[in-house]
């Protein structure tokens, strides 16, 4: 088997940051935004979606697109169902926060549920309040009813759930089982008793700010704060030991109920290390489920995560619409998480300038879909296209960008003055940043022989500050200067700057090395999820499907991709010889 290529000269040009229904509201609209104009913009965006046969694809749902000659389907994972348990001071709260942020699960805590029901004055809340006022424990039947009600809500069904510290007894576990509430995994955070006691006894409360400190692990910032710290009543050694004893009795009782899905994690480590193990476990569950679904489902025209027939040019509206929406949702999620320097790398044939089927209109359609979506949310979006570059005989516009500004100007943005109000066109540079701009979409910024776009790009991001800047298919590798030699001065700094943009979306087709046909597979990443490696498999009657081979927390190297396709382990790959070993070394 020949080695595989990513059909791109800059496979390693960027790294991605560590990675749920998301709104673009995390972008702060400028004070001069005109909300009254959102209605016509919304109509225009919906019109574009209808024209492209857009279908919003929520996470973990199924949606079908129909074309005249085929049916394309996308099947996404079922949501995760997670239970987590841990003794007081085991770090359970921190891990819950990290899990929710990473996987978008609905966090369910019985304490929060009780307070919410009581505060809302519901029938269950009133019954619970009677027991709480009398100093009695709330009966299991009331707590179970609250938990079951919360799990039945649409957000928990769609996004999955994380049940925090519940059930606490075997009887509660049995009650949940009767209601068919079963977790995919039961995580037990394990910390030695002496460490737990030290964590609790060493805690101190600042009565002024309510902030919690630890005399050894997290000391106060000043002597003034230190002087006013107090020990919480429950953090005495005697009470901590009593709480631990109760926890042990309860946990031992429920371990048998979830022994088949229980995983014990050493939580006496830094929170980042603990979460890395937790994240791996949850990702493995997702991967196994995806593979199981692939095997159990009829293949026919089905695809998972990526469409088939990508060698058919021009791409159908359904295929284009899928990728536009896939890119959009990943970008929205990344911006919501506070990322401001983003890049999208997508090289389907119509968006790959190295192929003779490259279509500038498809790139412009993608940019328009992104711009209208954010404008629909009331944001002022500036779409930027670099101008003519180079010197003397080398002056001109990169082929990939030829005519893009005019195309954008002549595109149908609607009759509501969207273009010029919520969406404006500009060039790349610090002077192009206006105070009213909320975000910037840069169309394929790239270096040219004799000139480097990175200086202008850096000036623009500096002027933009914390406002999001999204690069669509950038090509930032160094090229020769007008004299024909590489621009060595400042090259290291330019490359470092290029790496400050994190991928929010990656889609790259895989070919045999040195070819662009046939497609052997694909690499996909949609923020904040893992990189997914697919292999294209031919089927009867000229059909095809994509089989998920592996997932990666970070962007896989060409060697890792070769190994996955050949079925080699890393130890075996080190012994590779012949043509395979030679091509692997070429990638190094």
UniProtKB/Swiss-Prot annotation:
Pfam families: ADK (PF00406), DUF1995 (PF09353). CDD domains: ADK (cd01428). It is an enzyme of class 2 (transferase). InterPro entries: Adenyl_kin_sub (IPR006259), Adenylat/UMP-CMP_kin (IPR000850), Adenylat_kinase_CS (IPR033690), ADK_active_lid_dom_sf (IPR036193), Chloroplast_ADK (IPR053021), DUF1995 (IPR018962), P-loop_NTPase (IPR027417). It comes from the Eukaryota. The keyword Ribonucleoprotein does not apply. ATP binds at residues 89-94, 203. It catalyses: AMP + ATP = 2 ADP. It is found in: Plastid, Chloroplast. Keywords: ATP-binding, Chloroplast, Kinase, Nucleotide-binding, Plastid, Transferase, Transit peptide. Residues 202-235 are annotated as: LID. Its main location: plastid. GO terms for molecular function: adenylate kinase activity; ATP binding. Residues 109-138 are annotated as: NMP. Disruption phenotype: No visible phenotype under normal growth conditions. PROSITE patterns: ADENYLATE_KINASE (PS00113). Residues 1-34 are annotated as: Disordered. GO terms for cellular component: chloroplast; chloroplast envelope; chloroplast thylakoid; chloroplast thylakoid membrane; plastid. Residues 1-73 form a transit peptide. Its EC number is 2.7.4.3. AMP binds at residues 115, 136-138, 165-168, 172, 232, 243. Belongs to the adenylate kinase family. Monomer. This is Adenylate kinase 5, chloroplastic. It comes from Arabidopsis thaliana.
